[in-house]
From Swiss-Prot:
Coiled-coil residue spans: none
Gene: Irak2
The keyword Transcription regulation is annotated on this UniProt entry: no
Lineage, broadest ranks: Eukaryota, Metazoa, Chordata, Craniata, Vertebrata
Alphabetical list of InterPro entries matching this protein: DEATH-like_dom_sf, Death_dom, Death_IRAK2, Kinase-like_dom_sf, Prot_kinase_dom
Record family assignment: Belongs to the protein kinase superfamily. TKL Ser/Thr protein kinase family. Pelle subfamily.
Annotated ATP binding sites: 216-224, 237, 337-340
Full protein name: Interleukin-1 receptor-associated kinase-like 2
Length: 624
């Protein structure tokens, strides 16, 4: 069986795509024309180069790999086009370099004759559905068999712990994927948590032999039970073997999570209170969270009350602080979702259940290949490039935080099979444009439009009134986390801290002050094409009278006329001055009125100019 392109490790594909992306447009089109014969499809992929953060070569290879293209076909094509640097990236992944001709011999191998004929007929062979013959510089049989064997070695099982947390790893793999400074052998009981050891009998007694009435939740890798010991409530995480997992995977998973929990001490990360490594089962012990998970409270499951906006903002701020702390230790949680944000009796958030992926120490460990079907429950919180490519970086956690923030802001579940689209991320990403120009003003205006769209269409209404400024800042934090490029966790954290502070301050302000600070947009003057000239000719006396009515009414005289007192006149004068504002100088009276261009019209004019400069297509100008 041939080794297919989609079986290549992510680090190989990434290096290959970056190399081919740097080719000239002519060379790239020549390469792509051998892969895709349909010009319409080719132009569609080529147009994606305008989208920020998208590699058109990766999209091209993804399209080709879905049609069962092999690594042999890819190498043959690269050598036929004399793209030897790109071919070397693929060939360097092969386990048997002696079965390959040296790279310096490529120019001598590619001569007129069978090799050139094979390259010229590559396009015709693809049309006929025939496999492409290997070039003369590759040995038949051993090359693809070796590639297949290496592919199986380089695809780590999803249950395996990262290199820095593994216990029994072969020296060859350890030297290839891990830094030499990381210990290769580590005993489980050498951890600093020896004193936290629980016996099987203690856990069985606390959970009443894992009675079903004590079960809190059921997961892919573990079940959570509630137990009690010495009058204190605990949560017991009982690990279980997954079908098809490698031997000892549960031990490695236990050790990985223990090391992570013992290493991370933060008020917003769930602490580890104990562990058990018995013959019957393995278990981790955590404090019991009285208010369940954020997911339960968002949709008021059970008898729980609806979370208020200050509580929601505080929970989101705590979540961002927890993830930021993990990233400062070069640890990727990779399992951030509302179900894993637990709430204690004071509604303080505790991030739990990490998959325990430390950041890599070298380039090749930047990528972790995982099977998608094991992450179906978490797919709603994962970016598309991680699901497709398996590239695990800190951006995965930032994207997941954005989805959780959006859940709290909108009250919409991350996944709903009865909704179209099913995933909340697809609903939000349709609002966030993927194409951004280098013009700063256009990026700023586009971001404001996206924020307003999210607030107007999807804001949660059941949790009460959220000030407009807070809602827009919150939506900005969501947009920052979901950006394809330059997603910033720190920027989102600062935004949510501002929202939390503003909501706390409003609890102590009178309603009049709140209305001034969060003022509705109805009091903000807007420019329109239809100008009522009568509004410009209102006498100043009418304005003074209307403002004076705000003050307390004067006492009535016997003849029915109102005779204001001295204090009343002073109040009226001060009231009129406050309404009228500072009087402009005489010479500046005529220039106090000016015409301002409508923001939407100005943005449209800018987009039209960008369209004329071919920096913007018609779909982005007028919408799909």
């Amino acid at each position: 069986m041939a080794c297919y392109i989609y079986q290549l490790p992510s680090w190989v594909l990434d290096d290959l795509c970056r190399n081919i992306d740097t080719l000239s447009e002519w060379d790239w089109m020549q390469f792509a024309s051998y892969v895709i014969t349909d010009l319409t499809q080719l132009r569609k992929i080529k147009s994606m180069e305008r989208v920020q953060g998208v590699s058109i070569t990766r999209e091209l290879l993804w399209w080709w790999s879905m049609r069962q293209a092999t690594v042999q076909q890819l190498v043959d094509l690269l050598c036929h086009l004399e793209l030897y640097r790109a071919a070397q990236i693929v060939l360097s992944w092969k386990p048997a370099p002696d079965s390959l001709s040296p790279l310096s011999a490529f120019p001598e191998a590619v001569k007129p004759g069978p090799v050139a004929t094979s390259g010229r007929n590559l396009k015709d062979d693809q049309k006929k559905g025939q496999p492409v013959k290997p070039c003369s510089f590759l040995s038949s049989g051993t090359t693809m068999a070796g590639a297949q064997q290496q592919a199986s070695c380089q695809r780590p099982c999803e249950e395996d712990a990262p290199c820095s947390l593994k216990t029994d790893v072969p020296d060859s793999l350890q030297s290839k994927y891990c830094s030499t400074s990381i210990p290769k052998q580590e005993k489980l009981l050498n951890l600093p948590g020896d004193r936290l050891f629980w016996s099987e009998a203690d856990i069985v007694q606390a959970t009443e032999d894992f009675d079903q009435s004590h079960r809190i939740s059921e997961g892919t890798f573990a079940d959570i039970y509630r137990g009690q010991r010495n009058g204190v409530a605990f949560a017991f995480k009982r690990l279980r073997e997954v079908t098809g997992s490698s031997p000892g995977s549960m031990d490695r998973f236990l050790q990985a999570e223990m090391q992570l929990c013992l290493r991370c001490c933060h008020p917003n990360i769930l602490p580890l209170l104990g562990f058990c490594t018995g013959r019957q089962f393995h278990s981790l012990i955590y404090p019991y969270m009285a208010n369940g998970s954020l997911q339960d409270r968002l949709w008021a499951q059970g008898d729980s009350d609806m979370l208020s906006w200050p509580q929601r903002a505080s929970i989101c701020s705590g979540l961002l602080l927890a993830v930021e702390h993990l990233h400062s230790l070069d640890i990727i949680h990779s399992n951030v979702k509302s179900a894993n944000v637990l709430l204690d009796q004071h509604l303080n958030p505790k991030l739990a259940h990490p998959v325990a992926h430390p950041c890599p120490t070298n380039k090749k460990t930047k990528y972790t290949v995982m099977k998608t079907h094991l992450f179906q429950a978490s797919a709603a919180y994962l970016p598309e490039n991680f699901i497709r490519v398996g590239q695990l970086t800190k951006q995965v956690d930032i994207f997941s935080c954005g989805i959780v923030l959006a859940e709290v802001l909108t009250g919409i579940p991350a996944m709903d099979k009865d909704r179209s689209p099913v995933y909340l991320k697809d609903l939000l990403l349709s609002e966030i444009p993927s194409n951004t120009s280098s013009v700063h003003s256009r990026k700023t205006s586009m971001g404001k439009v996206v924020v307003k769209e999210i607030c107007q269409k999807h804001l949660e209404r059941k949790a009460g009134l959220l000030p407009e400024a807070c809602a827009e800042t919150w939506a900005t934090a969501v947009s920052v986390c979901l950006r394809r490029r330059e997603a910033s966790l720190e920027e989102a954290r600062v935004s949510m801290a501002g929202v939390e502070e503003q909501l706390r301050g409003q609890l102590s302000l009178p309603w009049s002050r709140v209305s001034e600070d969060t003022g509705s947009s109805s009091n903000t003057p807007e420019e329109t094409d239809d100008v009522d000239n009568s509004s410009l000719s209102v006498p100043s006396s009418v304005m003074v009278v209307s403002c004076a009515r705000v003050s307390s009414p004067p006492p009535s005289m016997g003849n029915g006329t109102a005779q204001p007192s001295t204090s009343g006149r002073q109040e009226a004068d001060s009231s009129s001055e406050a309404c009228a504002g500072p009087q402009p100088p005489q010479e500046a009276t005529e220039t106090s009125w000016k015409i301002e261009i409508n923001e939407a019209k100005r943005r449209l004019m800018e987009n039209i100019l960008l369209y004329k400069e071919e920096k913007l297509d018609s779909v982005e100008l007028f919408g799909p």
